[in-house]
């Protein structure tokens, strides 16, 4: 799936993550800022990438500002950002969820 | 070699610095030799010096050990002014031996390390930019971290030999009688500084408030003081202590506090004449409030409260629920003011408070203590020194010392953000699990299996689920996932002494 527009979901409150998706053409490129990057950086990138793959998004620039979010939060924020970026926010892709 | 809590202590450090590896929390009854400082005799007529530069030029030489206290906390002005003068004079190779380092001192210490002025540090702790710099290998020699009681011990036994102590005081007369209670920069107890005043080769008081001779009550006495320096400002009163202490509204902290209170009141130690120490954290303050109600309901009064004092503890004193406060430092203005006005609030020095090599310290008489933790592991070992990223950001404070109480409770949330507090192995062991009796989290408690008696008495409290510590660790991991192990280099950046002076752990340089 092609990203139609730059979209954002989430906040920078503690225990949240802010995901910004924009067009890319070189796979999924995650730029992660996180206080727990050393311990959980790989896991955070994996959750974001896996979630985007379920939307069949294969090219995207992802800016992720993490404030200690758990996996379920990361997944939820990524789904929302992806729905918005694909202009699908009114037609939720339930199969992906 | 591996010490008794399983930490690898490099052999060269044990050998070169003549250290023993940690073995036991038992102190026993050894004979200990104390040291006494050289005294330069004077009649007291010419002690006043008008500038920091003049006193530094007169007293500080390359290679010396200098000390400060941290009673002025984040409002401290003295440390930065004195260190700047020392750097300006090009003095090198000093050992910095303060009672602790606060954030307001960080940038100056980093600067002094970079200029070669400071080459060794011993402290209770460090945080922020300084902790980060040290963890990244800025200092060639490892920092030595000691608890408040251990610092007192090391000074008394000559392990820390202070050449010049620079002690900021909110008042002094011209001959050096001073206390911490009066003046713009009043902070209450001088507990930690009293060690320096008693044992340093040269004692320099710095004050912005010269008062008529003789100044009483004198916590630091003219018999101990070499010079009195008049300065423009000792500290910023607004930042010395936090203002009015606010009770937490955080439901997680309140839940923890409630359970801590249940543990205390169901323990055999909760009886008339018991004693306790609480810290200054949100949950600890809330415990004081619950404990007050429990004391009223059960008509129980405490004989004394110990340690760092806050206004809620002072309120208990005024209400007659606590008979005495034994005060080594004051965390807020209410506590500091009270020391001036209430004879039942006794100033105590760090040795009286917590020195293990003593003819009894106050902590030896302590029944119940509530302490915090950055991490606690399945062996009940506690880390209050390094963060989850391995970087130094804490202080031992009185943790190891107070943990010798009859009932030592660690109050901590199961997780903080994505970081588990209950872990398989703490990053750095500060207080050994042998000292810890109960862990209280928001989901329930874990009792150290070595305490068979407590397993029995605390296992059936309504609303207080009991888990094994392994179960709590698993619960934490289910929430946050399994973190990747931290990476460190081979370089040792800090040594963690146990309160008896043995090595309980070392901190390695973080790999980035």
UniProtKB/Swiss-Prot annotation, chain A:
It holds the Pfam family ACP. InterPro entries: CitD, Mal_deCO2ase/Cit_lyase_ACP. GO terms for cellular component: cytoplasm. Keywords: Cytoplasm, Phosphoprotein. The modification O-(phosphoribosyl dephospho-coenzyme A)serine is found at residue 14. It is found in: Cytoplasm. Its main location: cytoplasm. Belongs to the CitD family. Covalent carrier of the coenzyme of citrate lyase. HAMAP family: CitD (MF_00805). Oligomer with a subunit composition of (alpha,beta,gamma)6. NCBIfam families: citD, PRK13253.1. This is Citrate lyase acyl carrier protein. The lineage of its organism: Bacteria, Bacillati, Bacillota, Bacilli, Lactobacillales. The gene is citD.
């Amino acid at each position: 799936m092609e990203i139609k527009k730059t979209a954002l979901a989430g906040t920078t409150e503690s225990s949240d993550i802010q995901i910004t998706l924009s067009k890319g053409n070189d796979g999924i490129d995650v730029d992660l800022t996180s206080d727990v990057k050393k311990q959980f950086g790989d896991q955070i990138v994996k959750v974001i990438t896996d979630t985007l793959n379920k939307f069949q998004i294969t090219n995207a620039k992802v800016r992720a500002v993490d404030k200690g979010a758990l996996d379920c939060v990361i997944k939820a924020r990524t789904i929302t950002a992806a729905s918005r970026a694909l202009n699908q926010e009114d037609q939720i892709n339930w199969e992906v969820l | 070699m591996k010490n008794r809590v399983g930490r690898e202590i490099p052999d060269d450090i044990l050998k070169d610095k003549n250290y023993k590896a940690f073995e036991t929390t038992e102190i026993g009854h050894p004979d200990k030799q104390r040291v006494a400082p050289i005294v330069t005799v004077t009649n007291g007529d010419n002690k006043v010096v008008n500038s920091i530069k003049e006193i530094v030029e007169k007293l500080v030489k390359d290679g010396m050990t200098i000390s400060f206290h941290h009673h002025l906390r984040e409002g401290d002005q003295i440390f930065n002014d004195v260190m700047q003068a020392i750097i300006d004079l090009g003095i090198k190779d000093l050992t910095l031996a303060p009672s602790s380092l606060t954030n307001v001192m960080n940038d100056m210490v980093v600067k002094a390390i970079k200029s070669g002025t400071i080459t060794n540090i011993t402290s209770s702790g460090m945080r922020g930019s300084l902790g980060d710099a040290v963890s990244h290998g800025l200092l060639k020699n490892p920092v030595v971290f000691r608890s408040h009681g251990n610092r007192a011990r090391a000074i008394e036994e000559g392990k820390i030999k202070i050449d010049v102590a620079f002690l900021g005081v909110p008042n002094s007369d011209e001959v050096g009688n001073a206390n911490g209670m009066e003046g713009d920069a009043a902070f209450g107890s001088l507990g930690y500084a009293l060690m320096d005043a008693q044992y340093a080769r040269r004692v320099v008081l710095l004050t912005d408030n010269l008062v008529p001779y003789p100044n009483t009550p004198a916590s630091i006495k003219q018999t101990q003081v070499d010079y009195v320096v008049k300065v423009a400002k000792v500290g910023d009163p607004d930042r010395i202590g936090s203002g009015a202490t606010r009770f937490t509204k955080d439901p997680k902290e309140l839940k923890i506090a409630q359970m801590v209170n249940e543990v205390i009141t169901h323990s055999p130690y909760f009886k008339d004449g018991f004693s306790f120490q609480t810290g200054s954290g949100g949950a600890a303050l809330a415990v004081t409030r619950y404990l007050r109600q429990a004391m009223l309901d059960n008509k129980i009064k405490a004989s004394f409260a110990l340690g760092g004092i806050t206004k809620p503890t002072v309120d208990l004193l005024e209400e007659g629920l606590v008979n005495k406060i034994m005060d080594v430092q004051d965390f807020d203005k209410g506590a500091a003011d009270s020391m001036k006005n209430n004879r039942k609030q006794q100033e105590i020095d760090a040795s009286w408070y917590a020195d293990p090599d003593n003819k009894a310290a106050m902590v030896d008489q302590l029944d119940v203590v509530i302490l915090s933790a950055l991490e606690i592991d399945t062996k009940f070992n506690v880390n209050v020194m390094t963060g989850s990223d391995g970087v130094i950001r804490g202080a031992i404070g009185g943790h190891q010392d107070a943990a010798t109480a009859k009932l030592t409770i660690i109050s901590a949330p199961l997780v903080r953000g994505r970081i588990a507090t209950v872990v398989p192995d703490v990053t750095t062991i500060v207080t050994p699990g042998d000292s810890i009796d109960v862990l209280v989290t928001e989901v329930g408690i874990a009792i150290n299996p070595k305490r068979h008696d407590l397993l029995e008495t605390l296992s059936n409290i309504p609303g207080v689920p009991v888990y094994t510590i392994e179960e709590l660790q698993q619960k934490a991991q289910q929430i946050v996932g399994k973190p990747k192990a931290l990476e460190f280099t081979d370089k040792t950046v800090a040594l963690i002494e146990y309160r008896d002076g043995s090595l309980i752990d070392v901190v390695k340089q973080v790999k980035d």
